[in-house]
């Protein structure tokens, strides 16, 4: 199913999300079954390939659902992620996955640009989103000039940036992944974390993550 920008924006609105739930009600499940099912569902990407750092077979896997337009996600990227990466990801103890959950069409376009710039290079992708999060205010104005400037810094021509942000196939996949996360994983806001399949909603400090990871590594 092809999703236009306008349709994508409508789905992201509160009314659109309510309609989505109304059209596709979730089954009632017990807590234990729900947790087990969610842990299985969240383990693999749906449409877009995962962007991840750290060994796949690490003892702890953290999956973050984030929106490029949300300040709490930017704060995590700037204040928490560097310490998490240094202590646990780069040392092979944590496998960290970043998944997009755009809260508005601007975030969706910026996510598409990040993937376009990075290609299949996960390391480059994380460098790109770090840069984009630090320029969040300017990017959310979503002017042609601001996107072109980011693209230029990444080595893309203005035409390439325009092609990236109008990539219908990537937008369809982004929309499908967001819908799956909302309907099946109960992701409703960002950031949302899944730590070895256990959901943690809302911002987490490094101290909270450190304590949780430490407890899992001891098991």
Which residues does each predicted region cover?
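Structural alpha/beta surface segment adjacent to cysteine/selenocysteine redox centers
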Residues: 66-69, 74-152
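N-terminal secretory signal peptides and thylakoid transit peptides that target proteins
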Residues: 1-16
């Amino acid at each position: 199913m092809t999703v236009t920008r306008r349709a994508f924006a409508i789905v992201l609105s509160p009314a659109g999300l309510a309609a989505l739930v109304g059209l596709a009600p979730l089954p009632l499940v017990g807590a234990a079954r729900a947790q087990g099912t969610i842990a299985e569902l969240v383990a693999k990407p749906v449409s877009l390939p995962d962007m991840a750092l750290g060994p796949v077979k690490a003892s702890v896997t953290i999956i973050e659902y984030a929106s490029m337009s949300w300040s709490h996600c930017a704060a995590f990227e700037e204040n928490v992620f560097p310490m998490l990466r240094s202590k646990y990801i780069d040392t092979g103890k944590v496998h960290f996955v970043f998944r997009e959950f755009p809260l508005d069409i601007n975030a969706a376009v910026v996510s598409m640009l990040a993937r376009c710039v990075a290609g299949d290079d996960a390391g480059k992708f994380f460098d790109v989103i770090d840069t984009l999060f630090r320029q969040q205010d300017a990017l959310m104005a979503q002017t042609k000039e601001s996107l072109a400037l980011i693209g230029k810094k990444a080595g893309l021509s203005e035409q390439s940036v325009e092609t990236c942000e109008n990539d219908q196939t990537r937008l369809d996949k982004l929309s499908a992944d967001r819908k799956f996360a909302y309907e099946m994983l109960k992701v409703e806001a960002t950031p949302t974390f899944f730590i070895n399949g256990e959901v943690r909603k809302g911002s987490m400090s490094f101290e909270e993550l450190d304590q949780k990871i430490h407890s899992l590594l001891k098991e």
